[in-house]
Amino acid sequence: MIKSILSLQNFKFIKPCTNSSILKYNNNNNTNNNNNNNGINKYNSTFNNNNSNFSNKNLFSSKQYQQQSICNIPILSTISYHNKNNTNINTIINNNNSSNNNLINLNDKFNNLNNKTSPIIFNKNYSTTVSTLLDDNNSNSNNNNNSNNNKPSTTFVNDWISKFPNSVQPYLRLSRVDKPIGVWLLLYPCCWSISLAAPAGSFPDLKTMLVFGIGAYVMRSAGCVINDMADYKFDSKVERTKTRPIASKQLTHKQSLIFLGGQLLASFGLILSSLNYYTIALCASSLPIVVLYPFMKRFTYYPQFVLGLAFNWGALAGYSAIAGSCNWSIVAPLYLAGISWTMVYDTIYAHQDKRDDILVGVKSTALKFAEKSRIILSVFSGLVISGMFLTGIAANMPLFYYLGTAACSSHLIWQLKTVDFNNPSSCLEKFISNKNFGLYFLLIIIVSKLLQDKENENEIQKK
């Protein structure tokens, strides 16, 4: 149980020059510490790459930490635990000669200090070990009342899900109910094709859209469960995913499997009660792709393509739910446009984890395309717009459709021009923005169908 933690708030690196590093701890806290220190205490600890130990190891209290690295690789990771109440922060660096030291493996991963929290980690190339201050119930009894405040929190996210009972929270997080972007990206291709199948001069069938909306939510949730069950070992090693319920052992595989079974039953019940047989068969045929996707990142650099096959299946099913079958001249280019769209947004999304993906050994288009991502995704963006144009031609859409689709392309241009592939926050922002692209194109289809000449629509149906 970690009793005290080190706050890494201010730091700087200087030019490399030797094989050792000096860690300067500056205490700006004038309160009394466990060792009865008063005022400002300064402790310098020097460790050497060759002997891998610390000297001058003493108890200190620190609100500010400065690292001066004089090695070729920064010694400290930029991740830290922060004291819950921002009060005294104590740690001990014990003599490495002690046999009971708790060792912390060194790690050279470098992330953003101000945005992340994690245990203190040192560069693994230096094989240096440090010990942390453990809770000792036999000493410092004055701090017993505060010990719970100094423990790393087991609540991963303080959001609206946290208001639910503890037994329910893991299932909600497993379903990603707090991250609806996946539902929107799954639903929009369904709504596109439902709208394209609507009669000329008419709004799309809202009841069918509602059915597909519920189905998109349930199936996306089921897909997340399948993905997390397959990837729990990888997820536990990736900073962004290590708090997922299965990876963090909040849920067992048995509990997750039961939950998945309930979701699939609900989905099949909805499909059987609401859709025609052609569409039922079409929806059922997508299930192998859904199950296959989580495993593809082990074998190919193109799991995003498989995700595109699954996520855009609604471009086929939505049309057949209205028309009774697929008009392939319309839905085929729409489906291909959707796959290309997925390649764009999910490659951007994958750039968030590319460093961790290399460490754990999984593949993605982010790693495959690397520094050429912007150019390659520009090609896929062109395929998105081309597929939408071909769909409009096959569906005999009015001029407004083509003007609107051309305007939609500006969103794809914007996100590829402004995304910083080396900044996870930028990647996430651009990924989420794709829900706007999906909505824009849906509105364009709806307005275009209202403007469509009914005589031209009859000619299409005869084909």
UniProtKB/Swiss-Prot annotation:
<keyword id="KW-0496">Mitochondrion</keyword>
<dbReference type="InterPro" id="IPR030470">
    <property type="entry name" value="UbiA_prenylTrfase_CS"/>
</dbReference>
<keyword id="KW-0808">Transferase</keyword>
<dbReference type="GO" id="GO:0016765">
    <property type="term" value="F:transferase activity, transferring alkyl or aryl (other than methyl) groups"/>
</dbReference>
<dbReference type="GO" id="GO:0008299">
    <property type="term" value="P:isoprenoid biosynthetic process"/>
</dbReference>
<dbReference type="InterPro" id="IPR044878">
    <property type="entry name" value="UbiA_sf"/>
</dbReference>
<keyword id="KW-0414">Isoprene biosynthesis</keyword>
<dbReference type="InterPro" id="IPR039653">
    <property type="entry name" value="Prenyltransferase"/>
</dbReference>
<keyword id="KW-0472">Membrane</keyword>
<dbReference type="InterPro" id="IPR006370">
    <property type="entry name" value="HB_polyprenyltransferase-like"/>
</dbReference>
<keyword id="KW-0831">Ubiquinone biosynthesis</keyword>
<keyword id="KW-1133">Transmembrane helix</keyword>
<feature type="region of interest" description="Disordered">
    <location>
        <begin position="28"/>
        <end position="48"/>
    </location>
</feature>
<dbReference type="InterPro" id="IPR000537">
    <property type="entry name" value="UbiA_prenyltransferase"/>
</dbReference>
<feature type="transmembrane region" description="Helical">
    <location>
        <begin position="431"/>
        <end position="451"/>
    </location>
</feature>
<feature type="compositionally biased region" description="Low complexity">
    <location>
        <begin position="137"/>
        <end position="150"/>
    </location>
</feature>
<keyword id="KW-0999">Mitochondrion inner membrane</keyword>
<dbReference type="Pfam" id="PF01040">
    <property type="entry name" value="UbiA"/>
</dbReference>
<protein>
    <recommendedName>
        <fullName>4-hydroxybenzoate polyprenyltransferase, mitochondrial</fullName>
        <ecNumber>2.5.1.39</ecNumber>
    </recommendedName>
</protein>
<dbReference type="GO" id="GO:0005743">
    <property type="term" value="C:mitochondrial inner membrane"/>
</dbReference>
<dbReference type="GO" id="GO:0008412">
    <property type="term" value="F:4-hydroxybenzoate polyprenyltransferase activity"/>
</dbReference>
<feature type="transmembrane region" description="Helical">
    <location>
        <begin position="305"/>
        <end position="325"/>
    </location>
</feature>
<feature type="region of interest" description="Disordered">
    <location>
        <begin position="133"/>
        <end position="152"/>
    </location>
</feature>
<comment type="function">
    <text>Catalyzes the prenylation of para-hydroxybenzoate (PHB) with an all-trans polyprenyl group. Mediates the second step in the final reaction sequence of coenzyme Q (CoQ) biosynthesis, which is the condensation of the polyisoprenoid side chain with PHB.</text>
</comment>
<dbReference type="GO" id="GO:0031966">
    <property type="term" value="C:mitochondrial membrane"/>
</dbReference>
<feature type="transmembrane region" description="Helical">
    <location>
        <begin position="206"/>
        <end position="226"/>
    </location>
</feature>
<comment type="pathway">
    <text>Cofactor biosynthesis; ubiquinone biosynthesis.</text>
</comment>
<feature type="transmembrane region" description="Helical">
    <location>
        <begin position="181"/>
        <end position="201"/>
    </location>
</feature>
<comment type="similarity">
    <text>Belongs to the UbiA prenyltransferase family.</text>
</comment>
<feature type="transmembrane region" description="Helical">
    <location>
        <begin position="257"/>
        <end position="277"/>
    </location>
</feature>
<keyword id="KW-0812">Transmembrane</keyword>
<feature type="transmembrane region" description="Helical">
    <location>
        <begin position="375"/>
        <end position="395"/>
    </location>
</feature>
<dbReference type="GO" id="GO:0006744">
    <property type="term" value="P:ubiquinone biosynthetic process"/>
</dbReference>
<feature type="transmembrane region" description="Helical">
    <location>
        <begin position="330"/>
        <end position="350"/>
    </location>
</feature>
<comment type="function">
    <text>Catalyzes the prenylation of para-hydroxybenzoate (PHB) with an all-trans polyprenyl group. Mediates the second step in the final reaction sequence of coenzyme Q (CoQ) biosynthesis, which is the condensation of the polyisoprenoid side chain with PHB, generating the first membrane-bound Q intermediate.</text>
</comment>
